[in-house]
Each structure stands twice: as C-alpha cells, then as structure tokens.
C-alpha cells in the first residue's frame, strides 16, 4: 500500500541520497528501519510505484534487496521508461537488465538504453562479471562517456597496472597533413 511505500522511501533515502547504513542490508533490516514488518524468511521487497525518474526517488540505485515495479503498456513503452528513468534518476552508462527470450526485444533494448552492459535473463548485480556470463570480473564497472567515465567496460586488474611505454623516433618523413586528411 502507498503508506508502506512512503515508509520505505523515507527509510531508504534522506535528502535525495541513499541511507548508507542500509546499503547491502537484508530485507528484514530495511523493512524494520521503515517501521514495518514482513514474514520471517522474506528475502526481497517488491515495491509498486506509479512514477519514474525525478518524480520517484525509489528509481535511484538502492543497492539492496528491493525491487521496484512499474507497469507499462507496450514493450517499446517499457524501454522508453527505462531510458527516461536513467536520464532523470541516474545510472546512464551503467547496467540494465531484460528478461526475455525474444531476440528482437533484446536487440531493441540494446540499441536504445544508454548502458555499457545489458544483462539478459540474469540479475543486474551479475554485471561485475561472474563465471555465469561473458563479462570480465570487475573491481568496478565503467559507465563510459555516458556516465563521465573513461571506460565503458568492467574495470579489471589490467586497468590498474601502470605501464611505461618507450617511444623511439622513427627515421622517416613526417606525414603530409594535406594528403592524410583529404
């Protein structure tokens, strides 16, 4: 109900930012912080929302077992909502997920959602690159120029190694800019 959603919203976010004390906590801890209760053994909290983007803070990254659910009319509408939400609430360049066995839907989403990783039929926390997908195991996930990062790949150990390159002068004529850029 809307009162429960409001309580969770107020527990999870303060002044527009996630409550760092609830990041990574189990569902019962989050629910208790909101002054609510759930049956014993609850692992995931699903919240139905009516708005996206700037209008709904629950659309921001929560980093906990909270799933935000929003209805849509058509698949194309859902993809547009995902794009709008990322542009307004944050996450551009990071990761999106789609659960579909329709290759046309996967392609449609991949061509439109501005992310470095689109995970298909798997949870988005798997963007770090476990052995269950083809992504490189990451210490961090680059968001590319979409997210003001230099990389749009998973940041791996080799990105953290300093490399010195020795460049010797070539014994050749300089390139002719006129010919090169015609």
Can you say where each PLM-predicted feature lies in the sequence?
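Substrate-access "cap/lid" subdomains that shape
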Residues: 31
